[in-house]
Amino acid sequence: ATDSVYLSATNSALVGGDFYTLVRLPDDCAVMILGDVSGKGIEAASMSALVKTALTAYAWEGAGPARMARSLNSMLMGFSRVETFVTAFIAKIDLKAGRATYCSAGHPPTMVIRPESMPLGGDEARGGEVELLGCQSGVIGAFESMVYETGVFTFAPGDMLFMYTDGTIEARDRTGAFFGEQRLRDLLLSVSGEGVSGICGKVLGELDRFTESALDDDIALVSLEFLRGRS
């Protein structure tokens, strides 16, 4: 189950550099991608479409997240006349194993929401928590020699993956204070018991309240809930 929302800072048209896609693969596997291409408007939207297409192709070729980032980096570095930087979170998810590998290339830390669970049999109850995925690599398209690392996380049914672009935590209120990572974590934990449906809308609503409807960057939010045997 997934939930997503996109808001462009370009008021004249709903275009921008943020993009996301879920690629469903055979054998209960999937690749989740959220990215942010430098710039705004039509040019950023055009480049984000190209980047999204390339990453989707790499996913179908069976590449892992770090290899996908390396391949995209090589492609962008080959565009000698175009200086484009991309931040991206790429996760390859094995739903049967309850395990995923990921590469976070210059991207804000993705969060795994683990809602409070009731005990089953002799098990102990699990308190709710929000885990930051801390394995970080550099941006894509900056240096040919950039190294991209692979991180791993596990998940249980009911856990949720929350991905967002930097405009989320960099949103400011009228005093100049950032919305920030901790405020986002606290908000996600407070709504985690409600499930994935509408969670992105709740975050966007809080951002709108915090900034007094004055968001000045493209924002993409994607939440994915892990269910038994499917996403």
Predicted regions and their residues:
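Short, glycine/charged-enriched secondary-structure capping and boundary segments
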Residues: M47-A49, G176-F179
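Cytochrome P450 core scaffold surrounding the K-helix E-X-X-R motif
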Residues: V112-P115, R172-F178
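… and, occasionally, acidic/histidine-rich disordered N-termini of signaling adaptors
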Residues: A1-F162, R209-S231
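ABC-family ATPase nucleotide-binding domain "signature/switch" substructure
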Residues: A171, D208
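Short Ser/Thr-interspersed hydrophobic loop/turn segments at strand-loop and sheet-helix junctions
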Residues: T168
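Divalent-cation-assisted or electrostatically stabilized phosphate/pyrophosphate-binding catalytic cores
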Residues: A156-P157, A177-S192
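Short, charged, surface-exposed loops that flank catalytic or proteolytic processing sites
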Residues: A63-M68, V191-C200
